[in-house]
């Protein structure tokens, strides 16, 4: 039997978690070692503090005062509407293109989610989204990166953050597809961390088996710790990478390594730049960027009443207009700063139903949505915004850049996303002088063209044929 360090027992006793050892004598040596390793990695005192705070009626932050203090973001680069605006965007694009040529850019894709909500029992990145082919989300992003490499004659490392649920299958999928010709040595898979679920009533850590804590991913804010623990921040520094283009797996129309966005980020020496789009209505379920007491923050839609969401400022502009696309550019040194003190990103509480093993060793599966049995903990990457000294917000072109796949049907579904990909393709063809019926699907690989100008030139030269689109 594996001897238990007295310090471990003391910590478990102090934090009311001694139940974690209830089946220890029944476990094999390897199972004992695994359980003790999980316990050793867990900050038991912090979890106890968070649970106690979650049981208080009041919030540690005065939510009402926070919303009242919110203002429309002040430092925003809006979409161009004048010749001067267009010139500014052109100059930013040139700066961004130079950053790409100099090899200072890498891509981070957050790919920890399964496609369950789409009726797809695999990592969401493997979901086929091409309007005419079975091109997957992973393939679309890989082809964008490869096309950027070819255009700017540069290296662009691709960092893919997986979860325990998606890591193995993602690795196998990329290997089977030869990393879409990017080269295995430039694609880095790394796994986000996990945190235990707590019993909502008692604060006790739940167990999923006799030897395992009930763990769940630690949220996209776990990116910072995951990059550091995988040694990737050091690797990026060695390769002189300065800018990390961050996006989530579910948006096939994101413009990866967007030169204009990179250019504005570099010009302003921003530590954290965020792409936003104007909400379609105050009721749209999107987090929004705002200024609160001189800092950039995100207010989640769930924090706002319908009346607050529709509030306008003195100019008649919605205060809460700037919808978060989850497209960011991080300064690498800023991520290193965050990694040096992980406590800067707070843990958030979500009440969920979580299956667990009870004191008799039987599995219980709660299913009362009105009274969730557990507390899950996660970090949000956008909590880095108020920590940064220099932030920037850039308004994107919503119809071009933000068409996510989140739901099985209706808004933000595979149907709407494929329709957007086809529409963008038809618009590019129209710019090249080819009219395509609105009901005809079009699919343009990034390797055929990254934008309308490139498509026009390649159709004219014969490098791309209309029949191939």
Could you say what each language-model-derived stretch is?
Residues 184-284:
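Conserved beta-loop-beta/alpha segment of the NTase-like Rossmann-fold superfamily
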Residues 3-188, 196, 207-225, 229-233, ...:
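N-terminal glycine-rich phosphate-binding loop and ensuing alpha1 helix
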Residues 111-112, 249, 332:
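Residues immediately flanking
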């Amino acid at each position: 039997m594996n001897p238990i360090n007295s310090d471990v027992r003391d910590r478990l006793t102090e934090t009311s978690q001694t139940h974690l050892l209830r089946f220890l004598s029944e476990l094999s040596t390897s199972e004992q070692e695994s359980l003790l390793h999980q316990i050793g990695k867990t900050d038991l005192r912090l979890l106890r503090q968070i649970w106690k705070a979650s049981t208080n009626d009041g919030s540690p932050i005065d939510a009402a005062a926070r919303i009242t203090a919110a203002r429309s973001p002040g430092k925003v680069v809006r979409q161009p509407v004048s010749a001067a605006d267009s010139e500014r965007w052109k100059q930013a694009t040139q700066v961004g293109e130079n950053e790409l040529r100099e090899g200072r850019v890498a891509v981070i894709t957050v790919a920890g989610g399964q496609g369950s909500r789409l009726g797809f029992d695999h990592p969401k990145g493997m979901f086929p989204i091409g309007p005419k082919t079975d091109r997957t989300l992973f393939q679309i992003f890989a082809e964008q990166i490869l096309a950027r490499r070819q255009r700017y004659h540069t290296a662009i490392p691709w960092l893919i953050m997986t979860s325990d649920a998606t890591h193995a299958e993602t690795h196998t999928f990329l290997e089977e597809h030869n990393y879409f010709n990017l080269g295995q040595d430039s694609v880095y898979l790394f796994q986000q961390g996990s945190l235990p679920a707590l019993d909502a009533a008692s604060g006790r850590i739940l167990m999923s088996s006799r030897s395992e804590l009930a763990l769940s991913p630690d949220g996209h804010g776990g990116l910072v710790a995951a990059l550091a623990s995988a040694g990737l921040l050091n690797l990026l520094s060695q390769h002189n990478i300065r800018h990390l283009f961050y996006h989530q797996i579910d948006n096939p129309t994101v413009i990866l390594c967007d030169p204009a966005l990179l250019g504005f980020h570099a010009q302003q020496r921003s530590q954290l730049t965020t792409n936003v789009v104007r909400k379609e209505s105050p009721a749209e379920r999107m987090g929004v960027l705002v200024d609160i007491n001189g800092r950039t923050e995100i207010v989640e839609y769930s924090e706002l009443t319908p009346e607050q969401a529709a509030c306008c400022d003195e100019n008649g502009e919605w205060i809460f207009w700037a919808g978060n696309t989850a497209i960011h550019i991080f300064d690498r040194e800023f991520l290193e700063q965050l990694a040096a003190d992980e406590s800067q990103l707070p843990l958030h509480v979500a009440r969920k139903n979580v299956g667990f093993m009870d004191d008799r060793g039987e599995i219980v599966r709660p299913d009362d949505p009105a009274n969730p049995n557990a507390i899950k903990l996660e970090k949000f990457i956008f909590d880095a915004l108020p920590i940064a000294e220099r932030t920037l917000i850039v308004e994107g072109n919503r119809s071009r850049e933000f068409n996510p796949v989140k739901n099985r049907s209706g808004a933000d579904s595979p149907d709407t996303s494929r329709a957007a990909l086809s529409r963008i393709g038809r618009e590019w063809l129209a710019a090249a002088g080819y009219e395509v019926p609105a009901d005809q699907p079009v699919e343009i690989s990034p390797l055929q063209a990254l934008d309308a100008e490139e498509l026009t030139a390649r159709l004219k030269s014969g490098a791309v044929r209309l029949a191939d689109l």
